[in-house]
C-alpha cells in the first residue's frame, strides 16, 4: 500500500513539474533513467540549499542495487528498520531506510 501512495504522490509531483495534463504511469517508473535523473537532480538541488552549507557534501547518484534494496524494504512494510549491519551495508556503503507509514 505504501508503494502505491508513494508512486501516486511521485506521479502527481512529476506531472506538475513537467506540465503534463494526463498521467502515463509507465513514464514515471523509477526504472526509467529520465525519472532517476530527475529524482537525483532534485535531491542534489535541495541538498545544495542547506543552511549552513555542508562541508564536503558528496553528490548523490542513482544505484540500482540500493534501489532494489529500498523496494524490498517497502514491499515488506513491517514498520521496522533493519537492525543488522549486514542488512544496512550494500557494496561497502552504509544505507538506512525508514518506512514511516503503510
Swiss-Prot record:
Domain SCP: 41-80
Leader peptide range in chain numbering: 1-19
Family: Belongs to the CRISP family.
Summary of the tissues where the protein is detected: Expressed by the venom gland.
Gene Ontology CC, one term: extracellular region
Name of the featured protein: Cysteine-rich venom protein VAR9
Keyword Lyase: no
Stretches of the chain forming a coiled coil according to its record: none
Highest rank taxon of the organism: Eukaryota
Localization of this protein: Secreted
Function: Blocks ryanodine receptors, and potassium channels.
Protein source organism: Varanus varius
GO MF entry, a single one: potassium channel regulator activity
Keywords, sorted A to Z: Calcium channel impairing toxin, Disulfide bond, Ion channel impairing toxin, Neurotoxin, Potassium channel impairing toxin, Secreted, Signal, Toxin
PTM: Contains 8 disulfide bonds.
Chief place where the protein resides: secreted
Amino acid at each position: 500500500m505504501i508503494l502505491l501512495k508513494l508512486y501516486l504522490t511521485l506521479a502527481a509531483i512529476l506531472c506538475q513539474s513537467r506540465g503534463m495534463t494526463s498521467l502515463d504511469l509507465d513514464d514515471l517508473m523509477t526504472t526509467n533513467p529520465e525519472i532517476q535523473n530527475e529524482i537525483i537532480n532534485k535531491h542534489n538541488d535541495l541538498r545544495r540549499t542547506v543552511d549552513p552549507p555542508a562541508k564536503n557534501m558528496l553528490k548523490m547518484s542513482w544505484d540500482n542495487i540500493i534501489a532494489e534494496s529500498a523496494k524490498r524494504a517497502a514491499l515488506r512494510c513491517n514498520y521496522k528498520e533493519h537492525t543488522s549491519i549486514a542488512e544496512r551495508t550494500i557494496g561497502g556503503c552504509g544505507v538506512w531506510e525508514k518506512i514511516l507509514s503503510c
